[in-house]
């Protein structure tokens, strides 16, 4: 019983840690009520926590310290929000913006701090796609860096992005849009409550036909709505998500970012979205490939990161024995093992001994040969001196052996 309780505590702590750092599963709804939204324009109010990755981008006015909702965004992790580039046409300074997380209702022109579980954050950096074309809304995508990082919780969680192998979203498919935008085309202001609605993906060729958008749709766009209109995103929904359910994972994947449209909910004028799939590499180049893989469904892409980490162990296999590093002699042995090429330095000492012996042998023989005659002569002379001493004609006793060897050499033949 005790081990089970311990395991439950550990599981809860791990889940809480992942939730706090936004490293947990992406695309999970905390409050699911999919049958509610049958009709943004034509939508219905969402339940609190239904879309935890929804972010409210609000312009901050310094003259009255009030915030005004302007665009939506998608939370990717504690540091990054994905949105549309055209949201920053008029306000490009980071100090002009505030980010509200976990909200279901937003107050237009509020000057009060948000209350938990909502979180308010500043903008550290705005990254607009380098090839964004205003007016034509080409490459209408941007990233916002959050400061300080926002923790995830019951009403705040990361959204999912498609896998690289997924390809662009294809019709027919029913997906979802959300936002605090206008409830009708010429509404007075944005909706105070988050709206949700079902929309159908529309084939790009049909959407680009002469009676629809007549060539204005690009391959990096997604069209969603209905031929008859009536349900659509509108002003104030820009930057928000177009989400399709992944039935295998039972999660939602953000396949598009609300970009533009002609009017709101008009017939044959569906909402136009920036497809997220063509920009996965761009997103990875800004937030990092590991951060991107954390918000991509499925295991195939994630093992691609463990695979490189496996290579480092393989690189370390030559020094795999741990004691090489843990013991002091170990490190010295390994550096010494590389100096095995310096083992020739010990070899050079052996070569010196052989050369010295050869030179000494040749010199000594000639020296010994030349020295023998003087030694023979000295011995003969000594013998002669001994004989002469016996005869009574001895040398003075004060001379050394060296002096005797160097004097009277001519007397040698007399012996």
UniProtKB/Swiss-Prot annotation:
Residues 1-16 form the signal peptide. One of its GO terms (molecular function) is D-mannose binding. Its EC number is 3.4.21.10. PROSITE patterns: TRYPSIN_DOM, TRYPSIN_HIS, TRYPSIN_SER. One of its GO terms (cellular component) is protein-containing complex. This is Acrosin. Disulfide bonds join 22-152, 26-160, 71-87, 175-244, 207-223, 234-264. InterPro entries: Pept_S1A_acrosin, Peptidase_S1_PA, Peptidase_S1_PA_chymotrypsin, Peptidase_S1A, Trypsin_dom, TRYPSIN_HIS, TRYPSIN_SER. It catalyses: Preferential cleavage: Arg-|-Xaa, Lys-|-Xaa. SUPFAM superfamilies: Trypsin-like serine proteases. Heavy chain (catalytic) and a light chain linked by two disulfide bonds. Forms a heterodimer with SERPINA5. Keywords: Disulfide bond, Glycoprotein, Hydrolase, Protease, Serine protease, Signal, Zymogen. Glycans are attached at residues 19, 208. Residues 40-288 form the Peptidase S1 domain. The keyword Disulfide bond applies. Residues 296-376, 395-415 are annotated as: Disordered. It holds the Pfam family Trypsin. Residues 395-409 have a biased composition (Polar residues). Belongs to the peptidase S1 family. Acrosin is the major protease of mammalian spermatozoa. It is a serine protease of trypsin-like cleavage specificity, it is synthesized in a zymogen form, proacrosin and stored in the acrosome. Residues 300-312, 328-367 have a biased composition (Pro residues).
